[in-house]
Amino acid sequence: MKMRKGIILAGGSGTRLYPVTMAVSKQLLPIYDKPMIYYPLSTLMLAGIRDILIISTPQDTPRFQQLLGDGSQWGLNLQYKVQPSPDGLAQAFIIGEEFIGGDDCALVLGDNIFYGHDLPKLMEAAVNKESGATVFAYHVNDPERYGVVEFDKNGTAISLEEKPLEPKSNYAVTGLYFYDNDVVQMAKNLKPSARGELEITDINRIYLEQGRLSVAMMGRGYAWLDTGTHQSLIEASNFIATIEERQGLKVSCPEEIAFRKGFIDVEQVRKLAVPLIKNNYGQYLYKMTKDSN
């Protein structure tokens, strides 16, 4: 099986969240008890991906480096690249060409939160796919805000549209994508859309036309949260808080995922818990080390 690398696109100007994001990246804002970027990072980790590129703006990249470092504390290899201006999601593959090399890759948007017991299993099928692309569809009330996938009566994807005025279904394409290495050349060959961007929907449409696009359904039991508005930030925080307080288990905790997947050992978890020990997060990590003995 080929190696698969991960990209987190954490750029953009976050204008819909002004004035909150006038001085700080949206992806550094808190979602309950952790920075937003921990959630997409955890998604890639749950897929078993350890080589990850974070793409952000010139002003925000140093802040992500300060927060996340080189990733070695979690058994990861984190690298960074700058996106000078937000010219479309597909630009991530051009910026990340050297990082991707000859490998397959996954892209997750830095403001997307995924939750579900079977999420690792769902992603495993995408990771193990030898060629082509996999995207994930989720039923929404407001499909006109997203890329929309249309299915025939057999459940086969037949069309993709970006933010259509009259959506052909209620299934939105989420901000998590798995591609083979062909995606790099496809991105380089793309023409900007009417709004001047290199559209991820155009990449997905090429794979669809070639008969190489798989659409995996995130059905009942999954949550996909898009945190682009003030209201959705509150809703996402409340969602995470409700689950964590009810179960006593953390959602998207990189330290825990790294430990459970064998990226780091119990001693490293203990070391990571020390500077956080005055709050619930650090105490949770410390308790985890005691329980594992």
UniProtKB/Swiss-Prot annotation:
Question: Which top EC class is given?
Answer: transferase
Q: What does the cofactor section's free text say about binding?
A: Binds 1 Mg(2+) ion per subunit.
The SS bond pairs are none
Q: Which domain of life is it from?
A: Bacteria
> What do the Gene Ontology cellular component annotations say?
cytosol
Activity vs pH: Optimum pH is 8.0-8.5. Active from pH 6.0 to 10.0.
Family matches, as InterPro entries? G1P_thy_trans_s, NTP_transferase_dom, Nucleotide-diphossugar_trans
Tell me the CDD domains matching this sequence: G1P_TT_short
Pathway membership = Carbohydrate biosynthesis; dTDP-L-rhamnose biosynthesis; Bacterial outer membrane biogenesis; LPS O-antigen biosynthesis
Q: Which cofactor does it need?
A: Mg(2+)
Instruction: Tell me a Gene Ontology molecular-function term this record carries.
Output: glucose-1-phosphate thymidylyltransferase activity
Q: Which reaction does it catalyse?
A: dTTP + alpha-D-glucose 1-phosphate + H(+) = dTDP-alpha-D-glucose + diphosphate
Q: Which UniProt keywords apply?
A: Lipopolysaccharide biosynthesis, Magnesium, Metal-binding, Nucleotidyltransferase, Transferase
Similarity comment: family membership: Belongs to the glucose-1-phosphate thymidylyltransferase family.
| Additional free-text comment from the UniProt record | Both catalyzed reactions, i.e. dTDP-glucose biosynthesis and pyrophosphorolysis, follow a sequential ordered bi-bi catalytic mechanism.
Q: What does this protein do?
A: Catalyzes the formation of dTDP-glucose, from dTTP and glucose 1-phosphate, as well as its pyrophosphorolysis.
Subunit comment for this entry? Homotetramer.
**Mind telling me what this protein is named?**
Glucose-1-phosphate thymidylyltransferase 1
Q: Which organism is it from?
A: Escherichia coli (strain K12)
Q: Taxonomically, what lineage is the organism?
A: Bacteria, Pseudomonadati, Pseudomonadota, Gammaproteobacteria, Enterobacterales
Which gene is this protein's source? rfbA
